[in-house]
Amino acid sequence: MKESRNLENFVEKKLYECKKKYVDIPKDEGQRYGGKHYEALTSKIFEILRKENPELDIIIAEFSLEGSVGMLKIAKPNEFDLVFKLKFPYYKSIAVTRDPKIPGNVLLDMTRVLELLKDDPREDFQRIRELIQGRLVDAQNFFVVDRLRSWLQSLFSQALNRISYRVELVAGVVSHLKYRTCGPAHTIYVYGDYEYSVDYVPAICLAAEQNVLPTKQLECFKRANTSYWEAIPKPLKPLTETSMISFRSSFYAVEKILLQDVHENCRNAIRFMKKFRDVKTNLGNCKSYYIKTLFLWKIIQEPESYWLNPLSFILADMFDDLAENLRRGVITFFWDPELNMIDALTRDQVWEMYLCVQRIPRDLRGAEISRNKWSFFVLREFSHKKERNVNLKCSSRRKRNVIKGLKTTSICKLRNARTNGTWTAGLWTRPGHAYRGPSETVSTWDTVKDAAWSEGIVE
């Protein structure tokens, strides 16, 4: 029992050491990217957008930074997702229905909104009516995903052309910008002394009473006590009868509250799994939201005390969940269990992710791993090699010299201690003499590797 507790404490210590070095955002990086420059860029872009288009100025309600720097972001914060909410006049009169063809999506009928706007004498509201009717809805008054996307794309392009795709947000430092669209996002890439990207994602604001949630999810929504949710204009493939007018339901504010209301071990585990995903080249198809979704399900399935377990226990359990979901080829959308979020991936893509993840729970539990190996396991799985090299301030030559010394010293000591000049495991040795034969034992070389791994100098 005591040995088990000591191992548990050792594992926790190594995880938190790794977290501090490779998972947490360094304070200077958070200020550099998540602070003044990022805020100044967003203020500048939307100042121009509002000025160039009075209609957009009326309907933009607020901004929210998803996966905020202090909560779920990891390491160097150079990618951001910012949701800007579009609140149309009389938005509570939008007729919201579940998309019968696409789980997790809704249809937005603007008929009643247009009627109310038509009877409203205010000039700015008349311009909004003309915008909706002329550019954003189809003949049946349903909001069209691609029309909203095209309208916003033209506005972003105009705004960036206005400043020649460059800004000086810090005195004497010019940043160059590039713009593209991908899915629902309007992405701006920043180059120069400050390098990062921002996905600006539009979201149509809807009232709490307009939700179309199943019973269990509705309970979560009510518990969070939020007054709104959003519909995201996410283009869909393949095309269906409704895909052009189908918007993805989004409950980011509710998700944020659910994650904040449990112990920080939950959020730390999410960040570790995201770091693991970033380190592994064959997990490119594992989106951050898939990981977040697994934790949302866990929150409603387990008592609050679950999150008081050691971080190593939670991580192993959540990697088990991820592996099992990938094995079955299903990650269920939290807000509509009928939607399999990885359904669009091929079987080979899903299986590749499964093979990468399936061994991790066993290794995290560390039952058959020496402490030295476990130390390196944590480094290897939750940090990039380049990060480790920088942290160790260790040159390639120094690595080779240290490894060479470890091999010579460890083999000599091990052989002399074990064999004393006798025939062992098919290898003849003499006292004080080291010779590596073709039948060198695995345990000998494992011992050498353990010593190097414990120093974090060799993989």
From Swiss-Prot:
SMART domains: Mab-21. It catalyses: GTP + ATP = 3',2'-cGAMP + 2 diphosphate; GTP + ATP = 2',3'-cGAMP + 2 diphosphate; GTP + ATP = pppGp(2'-5')A + diphosphate; pppA(2'-5')pG = 3',2'-cGAMP + diphosphate. The gene is cGlr2. It comes from Drosophila melanogaster (Fruit fly). This is Cyclic GMP-AMP synthase-like receptor 2. GTP binds at residues 199, 248-255. InterPro entries: Mab-21-like_nuc_Trfase (IPR046903), Mab-21_HhH/H2TH-like (IPR046906), MAB21L/cGLR (IPR024810). Its cofactor is Mg(2+); Mn(2+). Mg(2+) binds at residues 79, 81, 199. GO terms for biological process: cellular response to virus; cGAS/STING signaling pathway; defense response to virus; immune response involved in response to exogenous dsRNA; innate immune response. The lineage of its organism: Eukaryota, Metazoa, Ecdysozoa, Arthropoda, Hexapoda. ATP binds at residues 68, 79-81, 252-255, 274, 288-292. GO terms for cellular component: cytosol. Keywords: Antiviral defense, ATP-binding, GTP-binding, Immunity, Innate immunity, Magnesium, Manganese, Metal-binding, Nucleotide-binding, Nucleotidyltransferase, RNA-binding, Transferase, Zinc.
